[in-house]
């Protein structure tokens, strides 16, 4: 079964983008390549349980087992050594990516208090969009009683778009609630 958002992309978004930017070839049309969700767990250096609960939260949210990220080098100010576990991340592609994006845009973000839309300034110049989330409770799968600590995460949308404008239009047509 094709995810709802992928169907919308194929039937509505591609024609809309071709009309707006005048692509000659269907392969030129930008598409979502992957979504990376990263959770930095600074407390993991003292308490291994924190990392385990972050990993379980992230696997529930993403529907896929995350990998534990380790420190690349030692930093005395942060009291971390090389190869110390300091967070976890998960990379979603294809079906899971579309399902997660659909859930994020239509269920999770509208549940945030005082939500007025996401910033349209968080593009990196190469057509990728980053979004910071303050708490994992906005996802319906996370049970409020089982949460030991409110954790934020970074969500990065990697697209094949060449420019920020193309990527913004792609995400807007897919249903990303931009503020302006």
From Swiss-Prot:
Keywords: Ribonucleoprotein, Ribosomal protein, RNA-binding, rRNA-binding, tRNA-binding. It holds the Pfam family Ribosomal_L5. InterPro entries: Ribosomal_uL5, Ribosomal_uL5_bac-type, Ribosomal_uL5_C, Ribosomal_uL5_CS, Ribosomal_uL5_dom_sf, Ribosomal_uL5_N. The keyword tRNA-binding applies. One of its GO terms (cellular component) is ribonucleoprotein complex. Part of the 50S ribosomal subunit; part of the 5S rRNA/L5/L18/L25 subcomplex. Contacts the 5S rRNA and the P site tRNA. Forms a bridge to the 30S subunit in the 70S ribosome. This is one of the proteins that bind and probably mediate the attachment of the 5S RNA into the large ribosomal subunit, where it forms part of the central protuberance. In the 70S ribosome it contacts protein S13 of the 30S subunit (bridge B1b), connecting the 2 subunits; this bridge is implicated in subunit movement. Contacts the P site tRNA; the 5S rRNA and some of its associated proteins might help stabilize positioning of ribosome-bound tRNAs. Belongs to the universal ribosomal protein uL5 family. This is Large ribosomal subunit protein uL5.
